[in-house]
Design a protein with these regions (language model features):
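Short, flexible hinge/linker loops that cap or flank conserved catalytic cores
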Residues: 7, 25, 213-214
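Conserved SAM-binding loop
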Residues: 11-104, 128, 221-224
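Conserved alpha-helix/loop element of class I SAM-dependent methyltransferases that forms part
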Residues: 1-10
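S-adenosyl-L-methionine-dependent methyltransferase catalytic module, highlighting the catalytic core
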Residues: 74-85, 89, 93-226
């Protein structure tokens, strides 16, 4: 696919750095993957996302980007999000999913400024950094759904009709307890955790204790152009 073919789509849904996550894959219906190494023919287009996207202003309805922004520099993140604002129609939404290095398990990597597990993570994204970047942009409003702040895990209900995020407790298979043994084990550990604390435990406390079995937990935020 080339950009002329993208332009005739109505509506236009873009998945930035999307690899093979595009139409007709479940959760990515209507989405065109924009990637430096597109997976093949069909609903994908080649583009270096550090450069301007060759589409007119106010031409895109929905933009999605998961696990891409951490691979570019902070200045490049700002420039790309500003480019997305230009592209979005009034009423358009951009959904972002990035690693959240503010969680207790991965905070030591944020403190040292690098993550040797993932050397290709150029920017160690986190709630404080992403909020600062977003608040400097002209989006009319934003909503964080899934993030760590001051040692607390915030998890609001995510409407996936606005865009798929794979690496969340809802969708990542590592977070699922499918067998009876797993369910009993989780229930027993939860009970003992509550018992030892006199049952003065919130669901948020349980969520923090369990963790999400992910290498790095996700930060999810929507940006709105009203």
């Amino acid at each position: 696919m080339n950009w002329s073919e993208v332009l005739i789509k109505d509506p236009i849904y873009l998945n930035l750095g999307g690899s093979n996550n595009c139409h007709p894959k479940v959760g990515y219906e209507k989405y065109i993957s924009v990637d430096i190494n597109p997976p093949g023919e069909g609903w994908s287009v080649k583009q270096d996302l550090r450069k301007p996207i060759p589409l007119p202003d106010n031409s895109v309805t929905r933009i999605l980007s998961e696990d891409f922004l951490e691979h570019i520099k902070v200045e490049e993140i700002k420039a790309l999000l500003l480019e997305c604002f230009r592209l979005l129609k009034p009423g358009g939404i951009m959904r972002i999913g990035v690693p959240d290095y503010n969680n207790p398990k991965d905070y030591p990597y944020l403190k040292r400024g690098s993550d040797p597990r993932f050397p290709h993570h150029i920017t160690l994204t986190n709630y404080k950094l992403m909020r600062k970047i977003i608040e400097e942009l002209p989006f009319s409003r934003h909503e964080f759904y899934h993030y760590w702040d001051n040692g607390k895990f915030i998890c609001k209900k995510i409407d996936y009709s606005f865009g798929m995020i794979r690496r969340t407790p809802d969708n990542d298979p590592r977070c699922r307890t499918t067998s009876l043994k797993q369910k009993v084990d989780v229930a027993l550990k939860d009970f003992m955790y509550k018992l030892l604390r006199g049952f003065r435990v919130s669901e948020e406390d349980l969520s923090v204790r369990r963790g999400h079995r992910l290498h790095v937990t996700s930060l999810v935020v929507d940006l709105f152009k009203d």
